[in-house]
Design a protein with these regions (language model features):
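Interfacial helix-cap and linker-helix signal at transmembrane-aqueous boundaries
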Residues: 23-24, 110-119
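Cytoplasmic membrane-interface "Motif A"-like loop-to-helix N-cap segments
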Residues: 26-37
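Intracellular juxtamembrane helix-capping segments at the cytosolic ends
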Residues: 71-84
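Paired intracellular helix-loop junctions of major facilitator superfamily
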Residues: 81-90, 119
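Symmetry-related core transmembrane helices of the 12-TM Major Facilitator Superfamily/SLC fold
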Residues: 123-141
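C-terminal ends and interior cores of transmembrane alpha-helices
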Residues: 39-52
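Hydrophobic core of transmembrane alpha-helices in multi-pass small-molecule transporters
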Residues: 57-71
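Short, small-residue-biased leader/transition segments that mark boundaries at the very start
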Residues: 2-9
Length: 153
């Protein structure tokens, strides 16, 4: 991967924030989360299929991952407000954002172990795909305002 390709990936992070913010406002935080996690699932499966030395697919997959990373910075506050309401937003968003950071730490550890155990980072995408599926299920079942109504609906 070239330096230019690597430097271009954070652009997708920046685009993901307003894009998924718009989706969360226009559709719902739940729908935005399901779309985001579906992209993560698709990119994880693409990386498992591609293996190593497939630069074009690697760049495409990581552009998708960066898009979704930025997207969560818009989805998480919207989902927190939808689920807990604004009266309890600050306290609950702190917990949600802590979990986001914890996931980043654990993801790095899991990726490192995958490299150590299998000699490649490719297998780090197995738990990523599984967790994306779990996240989709959780979003569909639980990401709704208590009482069953989406905010603004």
């Amino acid at each position: 991967m070239t330096g230019v390709q690597t430097c271009a990936l954070p652009i997708f992070n920046a685009v993901g924030r307003p894009l998924f913010g718009w989706l969360a406002d226009r559709l719902s935080p739940r729908t935005a989360a399901v779309i985001n996690l579906s992209i993560i699932l698709a990119m994880s499966l693409a990386m498992l299929w591609a293996g190593e030395n497939t630069t074009a697919l690697y760049v495409t997959a990581f552009a998708g991952f960066w898009l979704c990373l930025g997207g969560w910075l818009a989805i998480a506050p919207a989902a927190t407000a939808t689920f807990f309401g604004m009266a309890h937003y600050s306290r609950n968003y702190g917990t949600v954002f802590f979990a986001y950071g914890l996931g980043a730490i654990l993801g790095g550890i899991i990726s490192g172990h995958a490299k150590d155990w299998f000699g490649s980072y490719t297998y780090a995408f197995v738990p990523t795909a599984v967790l994306a599926l779990v996240g989709i299920a959780i979003a569909i079942v639980f990401l709704d305002r208590p009482g069953g109504r989406q905010a603004g609906r």
